[in-house]
């Protein structure tokens, strides 16, 4: 579950819910309007009864909020799912409005970019002046699956690749062009929002992507497919596979992935009642900053097959959706593949395939090992209800796992950072009525902070 329409078994009043970028606040959209709630201490910071609000996205803890309303039956109403409002909550003013050709399904913000996700398009804006920088055409993406790095320096956008990568080990090399264009490859495209160019395509899963998350520094990407049994973590932008985790043996729909602030833990929520917390090795963050190496842990990205050593596209600002985009990236790699690996394979086949055997032999054992030895969770928690969608986050100030469900409840669980195991429920509140405390834990009776400019 993200800041989008909520599925079944949800509160009738709740339309959307989402944590902000540093997991310090929760943005809530309801049939009455929207609100901002502080996580610690828990308390409502801001409320506006502006009418049904389907999307609410904060910019960290500032007063800047992006809003999308639901359709209104009143013909005089200005509300439309195609209209985005950027609002200053402190000054009670609308900074700007943007109208799009189809309904807005997702909105992402960091301090440099605004990303608006439609079903088949992504719009990228400079947040300082709201200038449209780039438009990306995508395959149908009704769940608005994408991830934006909170970092201003490593400013990356990840979203499902529009076509299968031609060098994917999971694809059939003899398939037709229509089969090649299907969206079941499970590939993820990494787009640099500063240079406005594709930097890599990660072949993350065999089946379609269901969830993505980038860490706070924009150096790690977590991925899940619609099977939901395996979670993978890659370095960005090098696309080196660093971790593979086993969520469970049975398929589940992944609702949320989130790293903690220092990228040592990854929390995963699904349509089961169990939230899993996986532990990342201490060296993962540092390793993510470098380029991919030729060791056995390297992911099957495009570069690991076509021999290219530099995955970065040349920088440059453009508003052309093709130039610097997926087509340009794939065209470059298809040419490299034709001139590079294909010719190499033909030459090596004349030498009894010795080189081919070496390259394939180096890849297959790693794949088989990954199938047999995925890491299990370090800690877990059980939600009171099963079948509810949820958003999970890890507190940056306390060793707590925070979960918000589509029923409108906020849960805070204590995690043992040394031994792991089952987390302990510490607090439970209602987001619909923040004065309601349904646990025996005493609520902190302190003033809630106000949003800063």
Curated annotation (Swiss-Prot):
SMART domains named in the record: WD40
Region (Disordered): 284-324
Residue window of motif L/FRRG motif: 245-249
Topology of this chain in the membrane: Peripheral membrane protein
Subunit structure: Component of the PI(3,5)P2 regulatory complex.
Family: Belongs to the WD repeat PROPPIN family.
Biological process annotations from GO: autophagy of mitochondrion; glycophagy; nucleophagy; pexophagy; protein localization to phagophore assembly site; protein transport
Bias-annotated ranges (Low complexity): 289-320
GO molecular function: phosphatidylinositol-3,5-bisphosphate binding; phosphatidylinositol-3-phosphate binding; protein-macromolecule adaptor activity
Purpose: The PI(3,5)P2 regulatory complex regulates both the synthesis and turnover of phosphatidylinositol 3,5-bisphosphate (PtdIns(3,5)P2). Necessary for proper vacuole morphology. Plays an important role in osmotically-induced vacuole fragmentation. Required for cytoplasm to vacuole transport (Cvt) vesicle formation, pexophagy and starvation-induced autophagy. Involved in correct ATG9 trafficking to the pre-autophagosomal structure. Might also be involved in premeiotic DNA replication.
Localization terms from the record: Preautophagosomal structure membrane; Vacuole membrane; Endosome membrane
A GO term from the CC aspect: phagophore assembly site membrane
Key words of the record: Autophagy, Endosome, Membrane, Protein transport, Repeat, Transport, Vacuole, WD repeat
Domain notes: The N-terminus might form a beta-propeller domain involved in specific binding to phosphatidylinositol 3,5-bisphosphate (PIP2), leading to the association of the protein to the membrane. The L/FRRG motif is essential for the cytoplasm to vacuole transport (Cvt) pathway, for the recruitment of ATG8 and ATG16 to the PAS in nutrient-rich medium, and for its recruitment to and dissociation from the PAS under starvation conditions.
Coiled-coil features, chain-numbered ranges: none
UniProt protein name: Autophagy-related protein 18
Mapped WD repeat ranges: 9-49, 204-244, 249-288
InterPro entries: PROPPIN (IPR048720), WD40/YVTN_repeat-like_dom_sf (IPR015943), WD40_repeat_dom_sf (IPR036322), WD40_rpt (IPR001680)
């Amino acid at each position: 579950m993200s800041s989008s329409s909520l599925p079944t078994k949800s509160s009738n009043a709740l339309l959307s819910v989402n944590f902000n970028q540093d997991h310090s606040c929760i943005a809530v959209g309801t049939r009455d309007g929207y609100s901002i709630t502080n996580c610690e201490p828990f308390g409502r910071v801001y409320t506006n009864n502006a009418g049904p609000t389907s999307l609410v996205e904060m910019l960290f803890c500032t007063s800047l909020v992006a809003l999308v309303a639901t359709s209104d039956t009143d013909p005089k109403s200005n509300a439309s799912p195609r209209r985005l409002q950027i609002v200053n909550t402190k000054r009670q003013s609308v900074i700007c409005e943007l109208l799009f050709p189809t309904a807005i399904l997702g909105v992402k913000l960091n301090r440099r970019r605004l990303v608006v996700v439609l079903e088949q398009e992504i719009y990228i804006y400079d947040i300082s002046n709201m200038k449209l920088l780039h438009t990306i055409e995508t395959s149908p993406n009704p769940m608005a699956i994408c991830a934006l790095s909170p970092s201003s320096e490593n400013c990356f956008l990840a979203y499902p690749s529009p076509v299968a990568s031609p060098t994917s080990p999971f694809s059939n090399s003899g398939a037709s062009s229509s089969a090649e264009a299907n969206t079941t490859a499970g590939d993820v495209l990494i787009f640099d929002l500063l240079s406005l160019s594709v930097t890599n395509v990660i072949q993350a899963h065999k089946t379609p992507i269901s969830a993505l998350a980038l860490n706070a520094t924009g150096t790690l990407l977590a991925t899940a497919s619609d099977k939901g049994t395996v979670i993978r973590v890659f370095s960005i932008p090098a696309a080196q596979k660093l971790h593979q985790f086993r969520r469970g043996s049975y398929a589940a729909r992944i609702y949320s992935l989130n790293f903690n602030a220092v990228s040592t833990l990854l929390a995963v929520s699904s349509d089961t009642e169990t939230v899993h917390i996986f532990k990342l090795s201490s060296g993962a963050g540092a390793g993510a900053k470098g380029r991919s190496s030729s060791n056995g842990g390297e992911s099957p990205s495009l570069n690991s097959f076509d021999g290219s050593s530099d995955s970065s596209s040349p920088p440059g600002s453009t508003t052309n959706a093709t130039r610097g985009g997926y087509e340009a990236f794939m065209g470059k790699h298809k040419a490299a593949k034709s001139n590079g690996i294909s010719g190499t394979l033909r030459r090596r086949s004349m030498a009894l395939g010795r080189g081919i055997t070496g390259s394939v032999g180096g890849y297959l054992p790693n794949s088989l090992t990954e199938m047999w030895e995925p890491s299990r969770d370090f800690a877990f928690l059980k939600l009171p209800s099963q079948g509810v969608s949820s958003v999970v986050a890890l507190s940056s100030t306390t060793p707590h796992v925070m979960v918000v469900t589509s029923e409108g409840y906020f849960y805070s669980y204590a995690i043992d950072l040394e031994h792991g195991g089952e987390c302990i429920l510490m607090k439970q509140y209602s987001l619909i009525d923040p004065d309601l405390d349904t646990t025996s834990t005493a609520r902190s009776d302190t003033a809630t902070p106000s949003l800063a400019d």
